[in-house]
Amino acid sequence: MAVKIGINGFGRIGRNVFRAALKNDNVEVVAINDLTDANMLAHLLKYDSVHGKLDAEVVVDGSNLVVNGKTIEISAERDPAQLSWGKQGVEIVVESTGFFTKRADAAKHLEAGAKKVIISAPASDEDITIVMGVNEDKYDAANHNVISNASCTTNCLAPFAKVLNDKFGLKRGMMTTVHSYTNDQQILDLPHKDYRRARAAAENIIPTSTGAAKAVSLVLPELKGKLNGGAMRVPTPNVSLVDLVAELDKEVTVEDVNNALKEAAEGDLKGILGYSEEPLVSGDYNGNINSSTIDALSTMVMEGNMVKVISWYDNESGYSNRVVDLAQYIAAKGL
C-alpha cells in the first residue's frame, strides 16, 4: 500500500517531488499546502520551462487538483500546525517551502497529524540528516521524526566522497559546485542579503557560499573537518556539477579512481551514482535522476595522491527523486 504524502510548498522542489511520485506506485501525494491558488498550481505543474509538459491529465475541481483522476486536496495555510494532515491521512510531509528548516518549526507538521517530516533542505536541530546511498541505514523509526534530505549538492558529493574514502582514504579536499541559478537569486539587480546574489542571475557568474562540503560530515562522520568548498552560480536554469580536488592516503592512477567509481555505480550505489565516459555537457543531464554522475573523462591525478573528480547532477530532478526514495524507505522501515 502506498505511503500517503503531503507537500508543503509547491515550488521547484515541491512540483518535482510530485512528478517523481507520479512514477512511483509506493508513494501517493494526497494533499498540498501552498499560498498560491489551485489554478496557478495546476498550470505550473502541467507546464515547466525546464522539464517540459507533464504527461498527465491535470484539472482543477473547485479548490482542489485532480491529476489522472485522483483528487489532491489543496490548502493555503501559513501555520503548519493548523493544517489537516491527520484528517487527510497524510503520513509523511515533504517540507519544501524553504522557510521551516528548524526542527521546532518543521515539527508543527507532527502536531497537525503527520507521522514524519522530510525537510527538502539542510536543516538545524533535525533528528537526522540522510543521504540515500550513504547513511539511510542509520534511520531509527522510534527516534527520527524530523529528517533532513540534505542539499542537492551534498547528495551529489557524499556518494563519491564515500567511495574515495572507503577505497583510498580521503585525507582532505576542497570542492566547488558550479551551480545553476535558483530562486534564491535575483533575475535582475535587486537587493539581497548576499551582495553577489543580488546581481542578475542570468547575466553573471556569481561566487557564493555553500555548506554542502561541511555537511557531508553529517552523513559521513569520518570526514568531519576534511572537506570544505564554495559555489559558483552560473547562468543556466538547471543541472550543476561538483568539482572535488582531494588528497588521498594512497597513491592512485586515473584508472584506479575511475574503476572504483564505476564499480560503485554498477554495484551498491546503482541508481544513486552514475558513471559516464561520454563527452557530455550540462544539458545532457537535464532530467537525469541519479544523485550524481561521474564525468570519467575529467578525472585527473597529480603526484600520485592528489585527485580531481567531477560529477554532474540535475539539482532538481535528482534531488526530488531522492526525497521520494527517502519517503518510500522510511515507510518500509517504519513510521
UniProtKB/Swiss-Prot annotation:
Entry protein name: Glyceraldehyde-3-phosphate dehydrogenase
Keywords: Cytoplasm, Glycolysis, NAD, Nucleotide-binding, Oxidoreductase
Reactions that this protein is recorded to catalyse: D-glyceraldehyde 3-phosphate + phosphate + NAD(+) = (2R)-3-phospho-glyceroyl phosphate + NADH + H(+)
Alphabetized GO MF terms: glyceraldehyde-3-phosphate dehydrogenase (NAD+) (phosphorylating) activity; NAD binding; NADP binding
Pathway annotation: Carbohydrate degradation; glycolysis; pyruvate from D-glyceraldehyde 3-phosphate: step 1/5
Predominant cellular place of this UniProt entry's protein: cytoplasm
Family label: Belongs to the glyceraldehyde-3-phosphate dehydrogenase family.
GO process terms (BP): glucose metabolic process; glycolytic process
Residue positions of the active site: C152
Binding site for NAD(+): R12, I13, D34, R78, S120, N183, N315
Activates thiol group during catalysis, annotated site positions: H179
Places the protein is found: Cytoplasm
Quaternary state and interactors: Homotetramer.
Pfam family, one: Gp_dh_C
Function: Catalyzes the oxidative phosphorylation of glyceraldehyde 3-phosphate (G3P) to 1,3-bisphosphoglycerate (BPG) using the cofactor NAD. The first reaction step involves the formation of a hemiacetal intermediate between G3P and a cysteine residue, and this hemiacetal intermediate is then oxidized to a thioester, with concomitant reduction of NAD to NADH. The reduced NADH is then exchanged with the second NAD, and the thioester is attacked by a nucleophilic inorganic phosphate to produce BPG.
Annotated binding of D-glyceraldehyde 3-phosphate, by residue: S151, C152, T153, T182, R197, T210, G211, R233
GO cellular component: cytoplasm
Enzyme Commission number(s) of this protein: 1.2.1.12
